[in-house]
């Protein structure tokens, strides 16, 4: 009799419809991977066979389309890799859904509250400790401390045809006693800004005396910093570095002592004296104003003092057999013996995929394909139901024989 075969066919077709329906339902779920039901025949010493059974349900881990969102805490994985997440009990899960937010403790978590893990940033300035044990990534709402200026630079083009100043000796209060005045802003231990005036006084052919004065300190006086010496070609050959330049003391802060470099400065016989560029390595304190995840997985904070600071780096996990992962719901998986242990690393290194900031990986469900599969599964279900109906008619014929 074909009742058992038909019932097994109905059960298999129903399971197939469940899988297809689940795919369609999750066609808009970020990071979702479509499933496929596999079947096998049942055989028990008879060539006729005993029907069909579900051999297993596999998932397709090919990439979904990368969809731009513009949100700073959204990040999409392309090719290999999973985000590594931990729950409050320390259990580890893996996901392809890169939608993250901040919890009440300012930890980066997914929408279910699982904490995103990565390599920590430590030291001053912070650097990523790759290879360390992954830990939760947080974005602390703390003030960035001020940094005292220790080095500064000024690139200047001086006119060799400039006459000597008409007034001697040099006086910062008399513009006729110098040829050019510039400035560079530096910072002390509390982040107080000091406007350091730099004066250039031509003392002879190819020679210029440089003086500095802290214009922010009313008690400051101009001091000799260095003597610039140029060769006949206008190239700076001596005096390129002025050391131990000190600021005044403001608001009880320790004065900053820094070096001032004039490398790449030139002397030419045309054009006005011109300061090309100034730089320095200090800054004032700053509040966190924004943050984002970069394409290399680094989490960066942006501060009101126009500085950035590394806060951590997202770690990715790879497996020898993705299909061996166990689905745990909420769009996460856990490792199994079949999947193998997780291999950890960072985006763009080794066999790990790349990250796209401000984007999410869409579901890899092909709706057109799933709708066709649903029609086929429905016909399969109807055909097995028809087998039962036909078998019933045959039994009725036998019962009615006289």
Curated annotation (Swiss-Prot):
The keyword DNA-binding does not apply. It comes from Escherichia coli (strain K12). The keyword Nucleotidyltransferase does not apply. GO terms for cellular component: bacterial-type flagellum; bacterial-type flagellum basal body; bacterial-type flagellum hook; cytosol. Keywords: Bacterial flagellum. InterPro entries: Falgellar_hook_FlgE_sf, Flag_bb_rod_N, Flagellar_basal_body_rod_CS, Flagellar_FlgE/F/G, Flg_bb/hook_C_dom, FlgE/F/G-like, FlgE_D2, LlgE_F_G-like_D1. Its main location: other. This is Flagellar hook protein FlgE. GO terms for biological process: bacterial-type flagellum-dependent swarming motility. Belongs to the flagella basal body rod proteins family. It comes from the Bacteria. It is found in: Bacterial flagellum basal body. Signal peptide: none annotated.
